[in-house]
């Protein structure tokens, strides 16, 4: 492993560590994560300027990119959850008021019954991030499935089906060496 690969591997490990921290602990220091990510961006920028990247370096860069997207979405989700909880308690206090109008809340409940059939971008990023992290053995354990259920707000069967479909997609995209040789010569 050359010095670039070692540095990129370390950056990838640090980002993965932040993802695990955010997944496992409800309380974390966002400033610490931000400072670390900014320092890693500076390191990556200097590595990119060297223009002597190997295939392994490029693969590590792709993994870092995937981790950074997942980390970004997780931070956004945490911020939104915090804002949602503040909004919930504010609305709850307002609804406890004797001056609240119950007809408005009935109309809002009817609008919420319409559900989308596709997964949101955030859900896909969380699931894809998990898959990329566990690409060598993409079979979720019970605790991992529960974490994915909580972070994506999907049902157990939706999470399991997505993982199964993603494994199949990964398997179907791989071309055997014999077939690759035939395709290249033909």
Curated annotation (Swiss-Prot):
Q: Which GO terms describe its biological process?
A: cell differentiation; negative regulation of conjugation with cellular fusion; negative regulation of phenotypic switching; negative regulation of transcription by RNA polymerase II; phenotypic switching
Among Pfam families, the record links this protein to: Homeobox_KN
Q: Which SUPFAM superfamilies match?
A: Homeodomain-like (SSF46689)
Read off the InterPro entries from this record: HD (IPR001356), Homeodomain-like_sf (IPR009057), KN_HD (IPR008422)
Q: What residue ranges are annotated as transmembrane?
A: none
Another remark in the UniProt entry says: The C.albicans mating-type-like (MTL) locus contains, in addition to the genes for the regulatory proteins (MTLA1, MTLA2, MTLALPHA1 and MTLALPHA2), a and alpha idiomorphs of a phosphatidylinositol kinase (PIKA and PIKALPHA), a poly(A) polymerase (PAPA and PAPALPHA) and an oxysterol binding protein-like protein (OBPA and OBPALPHA). MTLALPHA2 is not represented in the genomic sequence of strain SC5314 because that haploid assembly includes the mating type a allele of this locus. Most C.albicans strains are heterozygous at the MTL locus and do not readily undergo white-opaque switching and mating, but mating occurs in hemi- or homozygous strains. Mating takes place in opaque cells, produces tetraploid progeny and seems to occur rarely, if at all, in nature. Conservation of mating capacity is rather thought to be due to the simultaneously regulated white-opaque switch, which seems to play an important role in host commensalism.
The role this protein plays is: Mating type proteins are sequence specific DNA-binding proteins that act as master switches in yeast differentiation by controlling gene expression in a cell type-specific fashion. Transcriptional corepressor that acts in conjunction with A1 to repress transcription both of homozygote-specific genes and of genes necessary for the white-opaque switch, a prerequisite for mating.
Q: What name is this protein filed under?
A: Mating-type-like protein ALPHA2
Organism of derivation = Candida albicans (strain SC5314 / ATCC MYA-2876) (Yeast)
The gene it comes from is MTLALPHA2
